[in-house]
């Protein structure tokens, strides 16, 4: 069967309509899990690095762009190996959209969480003795929380996370559709992630990603850990909604 040049380029880049789907031997699956761990490691490193060490004047803009750029770069780097999820909510949303094998969900999520936690451990070590006991307070500040950053409470944080994660999945499914221009999916996904961080950092410190929330909460103290449930439930709920809606919109 003769296929168009755009479709061939998309398949060679790993951004097929079956986004994130992997096949083949155990060795290939091991590489896919390693790619997910490395990609999530890079994402959480971007969050920690930008939030902890960027100039105060840069604020949320630095964090938002760091996250977007990290996902864009890693999607091009390893997206053809694993599909470039780097996010348990994305994995589950793609299952809801019929784009990913549910049997691979648990290994993917474990790899993502492991990569994120390792990144948080490294940045906790980088802070070292410079801040003493203040390291815990610093990680609390970059963890996903509600109620402590202003007037936004549990309901606002939950709704924000559901909405932005649903929109994120709709975008992912759309830009990886067979009918979408080839080669641009990582750019659109990275820019969308930047936008959603700009929107949600003042409300919930921007999660969209349970692995990212877990990673920073590990060193964020009791407060961050006690609120962690929201940043698993809301993004996953939003991702499933977005997966179902995205599948409906892209049906041919």
Across the structure, where does each feature detected by a protein language model lie?
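Membrane-interface helix-loop junctions and terminal tails of multi-pass membrane proteins
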Residues: 3, 8-10, 15-252
């Amino acid at each position: 069967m003769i296929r168009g040049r755009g479709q061939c380029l998309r398949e060679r880049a790993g951004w097929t309509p079956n986004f994130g789907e992997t096949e083949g031997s155990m060795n290939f699956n091991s590489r896919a899990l390693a790619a997910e761990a490395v990609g999530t490691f890079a994402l959480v490193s971007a969050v920690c690095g930008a939030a902890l060490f960027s100039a105060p004047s840069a604020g949320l803009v630095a964090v938002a762009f760091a996250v977007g750029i990290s996902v864009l770069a890693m999607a091009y780097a390893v997206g053809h190996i694993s599909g470039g999820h780097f996010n348990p909510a994305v994995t589950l949303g793609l299952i809801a959209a019929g784009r990913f094998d549910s049997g691979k969900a648990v290994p993917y999520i474990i790899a993502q969480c492991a990569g994120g936690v390792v990144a948080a451990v490294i940045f906790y070590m980088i802070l070292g003795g410079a801040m003493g006991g203040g390291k815990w307070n610093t990680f609390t500040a970059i963890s996903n929380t509600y109620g402590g950053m202003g007037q936004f409470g549990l309901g606002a944080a939950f709704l924000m996370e559901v909405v932005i994660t649903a929109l994120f999945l709709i975008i992912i499914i759309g830009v990886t559709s067979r009918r979408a221009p080839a080669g641009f999916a990582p750019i659109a996904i990275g820019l969308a992630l930047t936008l959603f961080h700009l929107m949600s950092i003042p409300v919930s410190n921007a999660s969209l990603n349970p692995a990212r929330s877990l990673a920073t909460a590990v060193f964020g103290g009791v407060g961050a850990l006690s609120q962690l449930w929201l940043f698993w439930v809301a993004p996953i709920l939003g991702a499933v909604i977005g997966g179902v809606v995205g599948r409906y919109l892209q049906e041919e």
